[in-house]
Amino acid sequence: AALNRGRWIKLLDNPSQYDYLLSPSGKSTQRQYLADVARVMDYLVSELEFRTSKVGVVTANGFLLRTWANVARGTGLPEWRVKQCVKYAKDRGWITSKQPRENINGDWYGLASIKRITDKYFRDIGLNLAYLNAKQAATQNLKKLSDSTGVHLRYLLTPITLLRKFARRATQTNAVTFP
């Protein structure tokens, strides 16, 4: 995260020098807007689980995803501004966000979205090698956590909301009785 922060400081010194920070028409983007994008990306990288590139925290009960409201609180920006910055990052292919849904009694409910930072982000800002090293270190740390907690790695990295959904589905399947 510190390398990411340092890189953004350099990028903000002269943003028009970097083509991936320019608007589609080739004009430079306002510095304050880029500073807000940098704050959002800094928060996301700080909360990044490097092995899967998901934004959140690994716990013994599963993966705890971060919401956009968490990002707003963590950056001190209003939620509408965070969403503007996220759109900017998505347009550049730096972030993906998928919204899993669950059907309960015929009604669909949205679960916490799974946010990922793409490899393209780290290539664009020039931190690809550091990212690959962090990814390898994260794999080793996750294996140690898995061994110490006795929880399979797959369950550590599955979002908690999806684990609940899968458990509910398994309970419903097992509840079916045959005459």
Indicate residue ranges for each PLM-predicted region.
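Charged/polar, solvent-exposed surface patches and flexible loops
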Residues: 39-42, 46, 73, 84, ...
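Generic alpha-helical secondary structure signal
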Residues: 35-38, 80, 120
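Electrostatic interaction modules used in gene-expression and signaling proteins
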Residues: 27-28, 96-101, 105-179
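Winged helix-turn-helix DNA-binding recognition segment
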Residues: 50-108
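Sequence-level detector for tyrosine residue identity
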Residues: 18-20, 33, 43, 88, ...
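Short recognition helix of helix-turn-helix/winged-helix DNA-binding domains
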Residues: 1-66, 168-178
